[in-house]
């Protein structure tokens, strides 16, 4: 079965002023859609068509060599963005088991946000910043391009796209401003759900 572009769980202008409508439209309808199209083209006629995108990305080493790069880039792009849309909401509320765990590990939510923001800002070129669960502990990691922590056996529960296409229309070269705005639209309920599913 072909992979499909998921619908956004909110209107394209729902995250204004933090993430603008035009960026959301281009990011979802054009960029994400292209990843889906190219992923389907790469896996057509292979047994990967019947697997979930999570399973494929978690086992990239077993993907045939001739399509591995295309699947890594476009499969990662599809998985990362599918998760990203769900991790955003116009009704952000900082609560839940995961928030308590963050405070326990970092001392405060602000300390966590600072480390996450620093790592996201320092990610050279295109990539992602993630909060992952690794052996029961929370960890902040970054990945290049469309790589996903699942490939390294870590479970992502929060992710931030730091490709320029995610913010350039509104923030231009001011990536730290975009990262700061991100905290206003984090769907902590979804982060909590993903965290609890790892237990």
From Swiss-Prot:
<keyword id="KW-0408">Iron</keyword>
<comment type="subunit">
    <text>Homodimer.</text>
</comment>
<feature type="binding site">
    <location>
        <position position="27"/>
    </location>
    <ligand>
        <name>Fe(3+)</name>
    </ligand>
</feature>
<dbReference type="GO" id="GO:0005737">
    <property type="term" value="C:cytoplasm"/>
</dbReference>
<comment type="function">
    <text>Destroys superoxide anion radicals which are normally produced within the cells and which are toxic to biological systems. Catalyzes the dismutation of superoxide anion radicals into O2 and H2O2 by successive reduction and oxidation of the transition metal ion at the active site.</text>
</comment>
<dbReference type="Pfam" id="PF00081">
    <property type="entry name" value="Sod_Fe_N"/>
</dbReference>
<dbReference type="InterPro" id="IPR019832">
    <property type="entry name" value="Mn/Fe_SOD_C"/>
</dbReference>
<feature type="binding site">
    <location>
        <position position="81"/>
    </location>
    <ligand>
        <name>Mn(2+)</name>
    </ligand>
</feature>
<keyword id="KW-0479">Metal-binding</keyword>
<feature type="binding site">
    <location>
        <position position="81"/>
    </location>
    <ligand>
        <name>Fe(3+)</name>
    </ligand>
</feature>
<dbReference type="InterPro" id="IPR019831">
    <property type="entry name" value="Mn/Fe_SOD_N"/>
</dbReference>
<dbReference type="InterPro" id="IPR036324">
    <property type="entry name" value="Mn/Fe_SOD_N_sf"/>
</dbReference>
<feature type="binding site">
    <location>
        <position position="165"/>
    </location>
    <ligand>
        <name>Mn(2+)</name>
    </ligand>
</feature>
<comment type="similarity">
    <text>Belongs to the iron/manganese superoxide dismutase family.</text>
</comment>
<dbReference type="GO" id="GO:0046872">
    <property type="term" value="F:metal ion binding"/>
</dbReference>
<keyword id="KW-0346">Stress response</keyword>
<feature type="binding site">
    <location>
        <position position="161"/>
    </location>
    <ligand>
        <name>Mn(2+)</name>
    </ligand>
</feature>
<feature type="binding site">
    <location>
        <position position="27"/>
    </location>
    <ligand>
        <name>Mn(2+)</name>
    </ligand>
</feature>
<keyword id="KW-0464">Manganese</keyword>
<protein>
    <recommendedName>
        <fullName>Superoxide dismutase [Mn/Fe]</fullName>
        <ecNumber>1.15.1.1</ecNumber>
    </recommendedName>
</protein>
<keyword id="KW-0560">Oxidoreductase</keyword>
<feature type="binding site">
    <location>
        <position position="165"/>
    </location>
    <ligand>
        <name>Fe(3+)</name>
    </ligand>
</feature>
<dbReference type="Pfam" id="PF02777">
    <property type="entry name" value="Sod_Fe_C"/>
</dbReference>
<feature type="binding site">
    <location>
        <position position="161"/>
    </location>
    <ligand>
        <name>Fe(3+)</name>
    </ligand>
</feature>
<dbReference type="InterPro" id="IPR019833">
    <property type="entry name" value="Mn/Fe_SOD_BS"/>
</dbReference>
<dbReference type="InterPro" id="IPR036314">
    <property type="entry name" value="SOD_C_sf"/>
</dbReference>
<dbReference type="GO" id="GO:0004784">
    <property type="term" value="F:superoxide dismutase activity"/>
</dbReference>
<dbReference type="InterPro" id="IPR001189">
    <property type="entry name" value="Mn/Fe_SOD"/>
</dbReference>
């Amino acid at each position: 079965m072909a992979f499909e572009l998921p619908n956004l769980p909110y209107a394209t202008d729902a995250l204004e002023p933090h993430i603008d409508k035009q960026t959301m439209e281009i990011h979802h309808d054009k960029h994400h859609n292209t990843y889906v199209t190219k992923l389907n083209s790469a896996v057509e006629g292979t047994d990967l068509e019947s697997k979930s995108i999570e399973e494929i990305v978690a086992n990239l080493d077993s993907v045939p060599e001739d399509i591995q790069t295309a699947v890594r880039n476009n499969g990662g792009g599809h998985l990362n963005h599918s998760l990203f849309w769900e991790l955003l909401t116009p009704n952000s509320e900082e609560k839940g088991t995961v928030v308590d765990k963050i405070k326990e590990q970092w001392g405060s939510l602000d300390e966590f946000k600072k480390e996450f923001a620093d790592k996201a800002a320092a990610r050279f070129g295109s990539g992602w910043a993630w909060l992952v669960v690794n052996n029961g502990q929370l960890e902040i990691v970054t990945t290049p391009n469309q790589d996903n922590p699942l490939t390294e056996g870590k479970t992502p529960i929060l992710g931030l796209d730091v490709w320029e296409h995610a913010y350039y229309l509104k923030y231009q070269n001011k990536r730290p401003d975009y990262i700061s705005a991100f905290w206003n639209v984090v769907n902590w309920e979804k982060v909590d759900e993903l965290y609890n599913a790892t237990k």
